[in-house]
Amino acid sequence: MSKSLQAIRGMNDILPEQTPVWRYFEGTVSRLLDNYGYKQIRMPIVEFTELFKRSIGEVTDIVEKEMYTFEDRNGDSLTLRPEGTAACVRAVLEHGITGGGQVQKLWYIGPMFRHERPQKGRYRQFHQIGLEVFNLDGPDIDAELIIMTWRLWGELGIRDAVKLELNSLGTSESRGRYREALVEYLSAHHDKLDEDSQRRLKTNPLRVLDTKNADTQAVLVDAPKMADYLDDESRAHFKGLKARLDAVGIPYVLNPKLVRGLDYYSKTVFEWVTDKLGAQGTVCAGGRYDGLVEQMGGKPTPGVGFAMGIERLVLLLETLEQIPEEISRQVDVYLCAFGEEAELAGLALAERVRDQLPNLRLQVNAGAGSFKSQFKKADKSGALYALILGDDEMAQQVVGFKPLRGQGEQQSIAWDALAAHLATCVVQG
C-alpha cells in the first residue's frame, strides 16, 4: 500500500481558522515598522551554502547540524535559509544600497528552515519577522530596536509576559581576550563539562555559556565574566544603551551568559524571553554585527538587527488569551437570498455595499439552499448579522436585517439605506 501524502515532519500547514491570528500579528508589526520608518525587503528562500558558512560560522550548530543543504543540477551547493540576516546582507551588498554610508532600515518576513527536533514552539519550517539596520553605529539605534519591540508587546497585550535580557560581547579583539581566559578556565574543569560542552570548548568556546546542562552551569558560576574584558568603546556603547532604556522606562536583566548562537555578533546582544511557553522561551533576539558586511566582502559597515519568531508569538497570544474577539470573526455580515431573482438582486446589492464600505467583511451565500440551510451557514460563518432577501423583500425593495449574536429584532432596511445602516452597526461599532 502506498504511503499517504502528508506534510514533512516539523513543517506545518497553517489552516484557515489559524490564519486570522497570524494576519493580526503580522499586520500589527508591519504598521509599527512603517511608523518607525522601516522599509520592507524580500529575499529568496534559497541561497548558496557558502553564504551561511561565511556568515554564521562553519563550527556553529546551525551549519554543522541543522541546515537543509542540497546540490542542484549545476552541481552548486544550495541551502534553504536558516535565518535572514546573512541573506539580507548579501542582498544589500549585491545591489549596493549601503554604499557611501547610506543608512538602510529594512525589515523582512518569511519562512526559515532548520533540521531540529520538532517540539512545542520549535519547527523545521518556521516563520520570522526580521529587522536589519546598516550604517548606524551608536547605541541609539540599538535602543530603537528594543523600544519598538517593547511598544509591540504593549500593543499585543503581552508586555507582562516577556522579559528583556541584555549583554555586550565587545569587539572582536576584546572578545578574543575573553575567549582565551574562558578556555583556560574551562580546560581546568574539563572533566566536569558535559560532552557537548567539551566539543564546544574546542570549536566555539563562547557557546558553552548558554549550556542547559546543570553540571556545566555549576562550573560556569565562577567562570570569567565578559564584562571584565570589555574594551572602553564597547563599555561606553553598552552604557549608552542602558541609559536610553532607563530613560524610556524599559526594565531589563543583565545576562553575562547571553552569547547568541551565531558567530557574527559583536557588542550588543539581547533576547526577549517568556516563561509561558516551556523550554522554547525566546520569542525575539538580536544584536549588533559590525564586522559581518566586511566579512562577506563589503566595506566596513556597522549593522544591527533582530528576528522574532511568529509561531512562538502567536502561541503566546493564544496562551494569554490576548486575541481580540473580532480577529477570530472572519465575516461581519452574511447575505441569504432565496430564489433566482433575489440571488441576482442580492449579488448587485452586495457589490454596491462593498463600494461604499470597502472594509466590511460581507459574504454572499453560494450554492442556493433552503431558508434553514442558508441560516445555518450564516450562523456557522460567525457573522454578526444576516441579511435576508426573499420574495417579500424583493417586492418592497428592502432587506431583512437580523442580529445573530445577541438580542434584537429583525428589521427591514431599504436597499438605498443599507450601507449607512451597516456602517453604524458594524463598521463603527
Curated annotation (Swiss-Prot):
EC number: 6.1.1.21
Protein localization: Cytoplasm
Keywords: Aminoacyl-tRNA synthetase, ATP-binding, Cytoplasm, Ligase, Nucleotide-binding, Protein biosynthesis
GO biological process: histidyl-tRNA aminoacylation
Signal peptide stretch: none
MF-aspect GO terms: ATP binding; histidine-tRNA ligase activity
Catalyses which reaction(s): tRNA(His) + L-histidine + ATP = L-histidyl-tRNA(His) + AMP + diphosphate + H(+)
Keyword ATP-binding assigned: yes
GO CC entries: cytoplasm
UniProt cross-references to SUPFAM superfamilies, sorted A to Z: Class II aaRS ABD-related, Class II aaRS and biotin synthetases
InterPro entries from the UniProt entry: aa-tRNA-synth_II, aa-tRNA-synth_II/BPL/LPL, Anticodon-bd, Anticodon-bd_dom_sf, His-tRNA-ligase, HisRS-like_core, HisRS/HisZ, HisRS_anticodon
UniProt enzyme class: ligase
Alphabetical list of Pfam families matching this protein: HGTP_anticodon (PF03129), tRNA-synt_His (PF13393)
Database matches in Gene3D superfamilies: Anticodon-binding domain, Bira Bifunctional Protein, Domain 2
Bridged cysteine pairs (disulfide): none
Main location: cytoplasm
Family: Belongs to the class-II aminoacyl-tRNA synthetase family.
Subunit structure: Homodimer.
The protein, known as: Histidine--tRNA ligase
Organism encoding this protein: Pseudomonas fluorescens (strain Pf0-1)
Gene: hisS
